[in-house]
A protein has these predicted regions:
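A short, structure-level motif marking secondary-structure boundaries and short turns
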Residues: 48-50, 175-176, 203
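Acidic, Ser/Thr-rich low-complexity intrinsically disordered segments
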Residues: 143-196
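Short low-complexity, flexible loop/linker segments enriched in glycine and/or proline
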Residues: 91-93, 212-215, 242-247
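FMN-binding flavodoxin-like domain, especially the glycine-rich phosphate-binding loop
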Residues: 1-8, 12-21, 25-165, 232-237, ...
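A generic secondary-structure micro-motif detector
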Residues: 53-54, 170, 208
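Residue-level preference for short coil/turn positions at secondary-structure junctions
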Residues: 12-14, 43-44, 174, 180, ...
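Iron-sulfur cluster-binding cysteine motifs and their immediate structural context
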Residues: 179-180, 185-213, 217-235
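Generic structural signal for beta-strand residues in well-ordered domains
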Residues: 9-11, 40, 171, 187, ...
Length: 253
C-alpha cells in the first residue's frame, strides 16, 4: 500500500478486494483512507475488510464502508481480529501481554481466518463486526475528537502550537512526541521501516518530519530500543508479530 498510495489512481483487475488494516484511534489509518480515495472502478467488486485491534474495533468498519462508498464501491463484510496492543504510551502495565497470551491470540486469529475464508469464498454480505457502537456514534455526534481528543493527544505528543487542522489531520503532528536516547547508534532502521518516509537522518540521528501515521514502527523495530514516545515508554515492552522480520518491513513491493 505504501508504494502506491501516492499515485493519482489505483486500479486492479481482481474481482475480490481485501483491505486489512489496524484500528487507529477507533478508526481507519490515514494512509488507508488515502489509498481507498485513489481506487478506481470498484463498483462491481466484492470488497471485504479485516481490521486488527488491541483495545476495541469500535465502528472502524463503518468508517471504512463510508470511504469505499465515496469511491462508488460497497463493503460487503467487515471482520475484526483481536491482536496484541502495541501502542505502548498509555497504561503500559495494563496493555502488555505475555508470550503465552500472544500465542492464544494467534490461535484465535487462525481459527477466525477459517471463517473469514468461508465467508469470502461464498461471497457473503452484511456481516460487520463492531463494538461500542453507541459510544462511538456519540463521539462523532458531539465532535469529541475535535473538541477534546485533538487537544489531549497533541499535548501528550508535546505539540504546543495552535493548529486549525482536524483531529485526523493532526495525527501527522503527533510525531512531536518521538525522540531518541543515548542508546541510538544511527543504524537508520527507523527511517527505513517508516511506511511514509517520515524520518530523515540528520547527523546520523533520526528527525521526524510531521508526516506521521502513528504506526510506531520506528519505536517497535529499533534494535536498541532507543526511540521513545513521551516520557513513559523507556523500558516498556516492544512488540511486533514474531513471524514478521525486519527484511519484510524493508521490502516495499
Amino acid at each position: 500500500m505504501a508504494t502506491v498510495v501516492n499515485r493519482e489512481s489505483v486500479s486492479t483487475g481482481a474481482d475480490v478486494i481485501g483491505i486489512v488494516f489496524p484500528v487507529y484511534h477507533g478508526g481507519v489509518p490515514n494512509i488507508v483512507g488515502r489509498f481507498i480515495s485513489r481506487m478506481d472502478d470498484i463498483n462491481n467488486k466484492y470488497i471485504f475488510g479485516v481490521c486488527t485491534y488491541g483495545d476495541e474495533p469500535g465502528i472502524a468498519m463503518k468508517y471504512l464502508s463510508r470511504t469505499i462508498e465515496s469511491r462508488g464501491g460497497k463493503l460487503a463484510s467487515g471482520f475484526a481480529v483481536k491482536m496484541p496492543y502495541n501502542y505502548i504510551d498509555f497504561s503500559r502495565s495494563l496493555r502488555e501481554v505475555s508470550v503465552e497470551e500472544q500465542q492464544e491470540m494467534f490461535k484465535g486469529w487462525r481459527k477466525k481466518l477459517e471463517s473469514i475464508h468461508k465467508s469470502v469464498d461464498a461471497r457473503e454480505t452484511g456481516r460487520f463486526e463492531t463494538s461500542l457502537e453507541t459510544l462511538s456514534k456519540m463521539v462523532d455526534t458531539l465532535r469529541l475528537r475535535e473538541i477534546v481528543g485533538k487537544r489531549v493527544w497533541l499535548k501528550r505528543a508535546g505539540f504546543v502550537e495552535h493548529t486549525d487542522l482536524t483531529f485526523w489531520e493532526c495525527i501527522q503532528l503527533m510525531d512531536s512526541g518521538f525522540q531518541y536516547d543515548e542508546e541510538c547508534n544511527g543504524c537508520d532502521i527507523c527511517s527505513k521501516v517508516c511506511p511514509v518516509s517520515n524520518i530523515k537522518m540528520i547527523d546520523n540521528r533520526p528527525s521526524w518530519q510531521h508526516r506521521c501515521e502513528q504506526c510506531f514502527a520506528c519505536l517497535q523495530w529499533c534494535p536498541k530500543e532507543a526511540i521513545q514516545f513521551g516520557s513513559r515508554t523507556s523500558g516498556g515492552k516492544r512488540y511486533h508479530h514474531p513471524d514478521v522480520k525486519i527484511s519484510d518491513m524493508l521490502r516495499r513491493d
